[in-house]
Amino acid sequence: MQSGTCESFQSLSHQRNDEEAVVDRGGTRSILKTHFEKEDLEGHRTLFIGVHVPLGGRKSHRRHRHRGHKHRKRDRERDSGLEDGRESPSFDTPSQRVQFILGTEDDDEEHIPHDLFTELDEICWREGEDAEWRETARWLKFEEDVEDGGERWSKPYVATLSLHSLFELRSCILNGTVLLDMHANTLEEIADMVLDQQVSSGQLNEDVRHRVHEALMKQHHHQNQKKLTNRIPIVRSFADIGKKQSEPNSMDKNAGQVVSPQSAPACVENKNDVSRENSTVDFSKGLGGQQKGHTSPCGMKQRHEKGPPHQQDREVDLHFMKKIPPGAEASNILVGELEFLDRTVVAFVRLSPAVLLQGLAEVPIPTRFLFILLGPLGKGQQYHEIGRSIATLMTDEVFHDVAYKAKDRNDLVSGIDEFLDQVTVLPPGEWDPSIRIEPPKNVPSQEKRKIPAVPNGTAAHGEAEPHGGHSGPELQRTGRLFGGLILDIKRKAPYFWSDFTDALSLQCLASFLFLYCACMSPVITFGGLLGEATEGRISAIESLFGASMTGIAYSLFGGQPLTILGSTGPVLVFEKILFKFCKEYGLSYLSLRASIGLWTATLCIILVATDASSLVCYITRFTEEAFASLICIIFIYEALEKLFELSEAYPINMHNDLELLTQYSCNCVEPHNPSNNTLKEWRESNISASDIIWENLTVSECTSLHGEYVGRACGHEHPYVPDVLFWSVILFFSTVTLSATLKQFKTSRYFPTKVRSIVSDFAVFLTILCMVLIDYAIGIPSPKLQVPSVFKPTRDDRGWFVTPLGPNPWWTVIAAIIPALLCTILIFMDQQITAVIINRKEHKLKKGCGYHLDLLMVAVMLGVCSIMGLPWFVAATVLSITHVNSLKLESECSAPGEQPKFLGIREQRVTGLMIFILMGSSVFMTSILKFIPMPVLYGVFLYMGASSLKGIQFFDRIKLFWMPAKHQPDFIYLRHVPLRKVHLFTVIQMSCLGLLWIIKVSRAAIVFPMMVLALVFVRKLMDFLFTKRELSWLDDLMPESKKKKLEDAEKEEEQSMLAMEDEGTVQLPLEGHYRDDPSVINISDEMSKTALWRNLLITADNSKDKESSFPSKSSPS
């Protein structure tokens, strides 16, 4: 027993390859030859080109039946020449075999792969106690082990396997018992069938059959089980669910698997072709002639009563259950040492259908696979490693699919060989296998392993060059008047109701509260600046009213309700220029503005009618990122600028002398040389300077009367204010830091997942709430948010409606079309660039977009605001990006150690609608809003600007300038584009961004939209500096007029390649060239040449000779 590493596998040789378990649905098949019939190969081409073909079609059935006969014929041919499966044709690699297996079409749903939960149980013997199976490890995606103390699970980690254990596992599958598509209802039936097969094949002596059966039926102890198993009523209900689902005609709610009825279970045929389904003969003579084959209701009851009582009420780990995907099935690995065995017992079982076996798995889901490995004492660690190997294989994406679709043991062996062909070996002298490897953040796709190679040496589904991100049907010209708008309405109308029902989530509440605070301040600030520029004709109350009305209409009827409307800098510049022009020429500002607004709305509607939004496809990532980066930088810059401006309103004494604090004072005195404006204001107010007691005035009174400040505690224009500026700085940076920290709280190690998720969703709102409470508690008079308290126009000489002509000459209505053209470009570019950024494919939006409908709503509301004398509002880039980021959906069901998958965005209309409804109601909430410090809102602006920069490729490329090549991240474009070309692309983009910034902050800001439009032409000129392939990786490809013709040509070429195949047989591309390419090897053949594998085979051959001299005691069935 101790003579060799492989001695425990002596009995494996008794099961020959020709003694396969018979699949219940018919023939087996082999893919060891590469000369496939053309009809066969056609059934797999659909997989190669990635087209999903529904299962169960008539053609599929006919082709599958035909293929089954040919597979059986090939089986016989293969078995005659390759009996033990040790050698295969040199031109047939495991990858080819696996790709053929995965291309098989099945007539039922039993072989459709499901997610798998794998559990490793080992049998434990203790003195004075009954043996039991103890859970030692589990896999959903990564391995988790029960720690040595037995009290807790380890952190998930990437399983590292020894090559020796993988070879031993291959030997187990190759020589052990393989039972595929077994029909069974209970674990006892499974054990009966496995042991019957073992005995009939001479792999197990009949005199120990009963003891092995008893060992398999021992109770299972799982890590989550405690001594008191009936403390929680809900646990008992789960056990009851499991109990009911194992009864006849019941359905598993988790996996949707029907449990087999009480009909006599079908089993595999033995070598005498005696069907288990039609016979109740004694397969269990080793158990004293007891009847095991026939299952009567009475027998079922007796077995149930014999089962361990704790399985009825065992606990279920509800937290772990949430991580298991719906429809998942279980794979149970049972390994251990039995003192009465002198040979190893190995079995691989696939159940059909999956059955819920009470107490076997840690969680109540149906079991699909079982792997049993029992052997003599002294090899426990070896068995454990083999169990880990098969469990890890079951979590491998490719072998997992092979296990579901395998028709015989050779398919399973091919799956193992393909896995060995893909593994990475760590040198033993440079790595400690006991070190647990942390799960990676991003797991590479395994699709390439499932796809065959094509003649040019690339994969059929290899990495395709990325194409433009905005070439969908939404941007195709219809050639009809308002054709694009009609299609937008048809596209969005079916989702209108779901846009409201999908908002029933705490995430939407968090997004709404956060963005309400974020939107309020810029709207009020914009209104205040507009009031200063227009002498109060349009101010804060008009800005609030206009934003609320426009936002509500857009959120209800817009094509992309995730877009948030707001005020923009170029609009403010335009308003200043227009007001100055009207004042110089004596024109009515509001009337001329109404005329310009109506012309702008009309021009935008004409753009909608002519499908002009289709031009958006020329706005590539180059333009998007330059525009978005500029807006983000403006947010950051203005947040810091507002903070610095507080130093003027709240100055500090930079030359303090602590010894002279008792002499510090600041008094208000009469100005020595009052200005003419001051004297005029005094006369109009009937104020005499000599009558004023200047020393008794407050700071606000002294400032309003234009008094002067005198004293050591006085600044240039104001008294020094203690603490306010420094406190504002603390509030500002505390807001930024706390917002970022709480947003990342979802990935922290503290508190349960639900708590972390809620804190992350409400991060900014909680930050604002905390800062308001702290500011209120400290009591320092920091500047607060000022909201108008009365709903009426700022000036009494204007109403809520403005006539376009008014007192202006009639020709001004016609002349207004000239500035309206500029405004139209401004509105169109701002709106559509933001919409393009929101609608990018990376956001995985499912309800479609509506560029034409968006522009129509903005145009209509712009006309309404013009008539009512309200500010114009258009898509706000940073607010919209922040809105999208706050509504990101991640998979709730992720395996331990696996990063949650990004699923998309919660697309709905409610958050935007509620933001603007509450904004309009803010006039009635001034008593609450007056407690919000302005530095906190400035901090929120900085956080929004900085967080919106994440994911912008432009800034990732800027970082590359200061990184050595060996430390650069593995960006996909760095693999395909030379670094100097990447830097050149970045420099050009930085130059354009710098030019935009200069124009934005200068008096030429009115032409800012024209410069954004010019970026499109700059991008077009870059075609002369970069190849098309380089631009496809660095940027989106520009659309071309011949694109459709090129696509048609590619399709014709693909069809011609398929037509070149002969009518007879089709040969795989590697045939005839395999030996010419030394880089291509057959892992199965190369493995058979290794000393390790030969040692295993020699041991197996010796075992055959030994067993031939000691025939099995079992009688033939």
From Swiss-Prot:
GO terms for molecular function: monoatomic anion transmembrane transporter activity; sodium:bicarbonate symporter activity; solute:inorganic anion antiporter activity. This is Sodium-driven chloride bicarbonate exchanger. Glycans are attached at N673, N676, N686, N696. The N-terminal cytoplasmic domain is likely to have a high level of intrinsic disorder. It holds the Pfam family HCO3_cotransp. PANTHER family: ANION EXCHANGE PROTEIN, SODIUM-DRIVEN CHLORIDE BICARBONATE EXCHANGER. Belongs to the anion exchanger (TC 2.A.31) family. Residues 58-75 have a biased composition (Basic residues). Residues 1-14, 247-263 have a biased composition (Polar residues). The lineage of its organism: Eukaryota, Metazoa, Chordata, Craniata, Vertebrata.
